[in-house]
Amino acid sequence: MKKTILSFTAVSLLLFPALSSCRTGSGSPTVQPEPASAQETADGGEEVNPYTYLGPGYTFSDGVLTAAPATEDKTEARFSGAFLDAGAENYRMDVTLALDSLYSSAGVLFAASESTAYDGIEGYAFTLRDKRVYLYDLTGSSFSGLMPAELASKSVERPKTGAEIRLRVEKNGNTYRCYYLDDAEGVDPWPEFEFVLTDHRGSGVGAVDNGHGAVFTSLSCEPIEENTVPGKTYRNPVFRDLQAADPGVLKVDGKYYCYSTSAPIGYYVYVSEDLVNWTNEGLCMNEAWGLSRSGFYWAPEVVRRADGKFVMVCSVEEHLGFAVADSPLGPFVPETNWTFDKTIDGHIFLDEDGRGYLFYVSWRSGHDYGIWACELEDDLVTVKPGTEVPVISPTDAWEQVSGRVTEGPFVLKHNGLYYLTYSGNGYDAKEYAVGYAVSESPLGPYEKYKANPILSYTSKLYGPGHHSFTVSPDGSELIIVYHTHASTTAVHPRTICIDRARFAPTESGVDRLEIFGPTHTAQEYPK
């Protein structure tokens, strides 16, 4: 079967507006059969089934669409679905459902049609199971059941027991967006996945499940106006022909300076005014501490000190140390000696009270592999004795898919809380991803977000990981700068991407860090 996805985006979570009535058609919307909330009867008083296709196990009664369990084997999936014609070129499809068991997966069927190649249907599905959403390409038959090919998946917060599950799919031209609607009211939704189809296969929309049972209590479809991305647009990766990884970005006087793993020995500095177009301004630091092993100059970051000088923390042959310069372009002069051995991925966080903290990954004597932190003296190159503590270790399953790794720390402060972001898994795994933890103190203790990771791979972008944050040119948007693999078949040379991030309110009162990415579709330039 020919795959039709040309470009793809996986994105962070968001909210839902109230479900609207089911309307189809172009132009002025006309109310059509509303399968989950209105019973339509024929002249003889019998309820009319509005669906043009009802798969095995699906029944429509009393205005409710039900998918009966098709298997008792919890390891088996027997996908089936039901759909009707969307009736509109661009639409918003909302589904409210309840799952029968922990093994149930169900959601929205879209771009569907009765298949000429199969005795059944084909299309796409956006589903929820437990605490994960999935995007599938579906083909199959009524004999074997629908055959799902996973295009992407993402962790989300598990629905509360008995809570209604709300999913949405929007079609806008050739672009589709899939939403898990669980945020607080008043927040505009961001999609979990965004992708482009050139062959829509069909115009059917409806419901789908994996054969373990679901009840669809509401389905509604309404036309929307097509809109395009306003202004100038970019597509990831923004570095294009430039090769770099582990980006640390500093904004100074309206310009962005990106320091990264790129030069064989030393560090290049890349400069931009808009975060999209970058130029290599050459080496900003040469050899440090007599260490000349090519390819082992990793993950630099730079901050501006109170006296106006610039301090770089860098990893050289698995030694962590500091270098100082008068300009963000360098030259950075290394301190007399490194600070720690068997340590990498340094990050300096400057708190509002002027205190500096160093975060890093260490496995030296007495240290378990993970992220550590300590307080710095005012010079930002000297560690305060007795302040070193472990803050993050690879204890969660998603951090152990490829090795046991938590690395690449970066700290944001929001509403008085400290958000420590980091990457999990080996950098060369497609599952290399970004998560975060929250604390009331810069040195912890930190509590990991229960729906990590918040940035993970898709069928188009592998290994989105080591990162830093900055703000857009006008300061109104939070931007994450991160690297990905060269392609889905090669890790190197890695390249740099940018996407939007934000803090979204939750019922707990602790805002959730969300990322609109990793994107592969056209996005508006940072404001």
Q: Model-found features: residue ranges?
A:
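C-terminal motif of bacterial Sec signal peptides marking the signal peptidase cleavage site
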Residues: 18-21
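Beta-rich carbohydrate-recognition and catalytic domains
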Residues: 25, 29, 33, 40-54, ...
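Carbohydrate-binding surfaces in secreted/extracellular proteins
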Residues: 93-95, 159-193
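Bacterial N-terminal signal peptides that target proteins for export
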Residues: 1-9
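Flexible glycan-contacting loops in extracellular carbohydrate-active proteins
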Residues: 189-217
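Short carbohydrate-recognition loop motifs
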Residues: 57-75
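Short, aromatic/His-centered strand-loop micro-motif at the edge of beta-sheets
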Residues: 141-166
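Secretory/extracellular carbohydrate-interaction modules
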Residues: 72-139
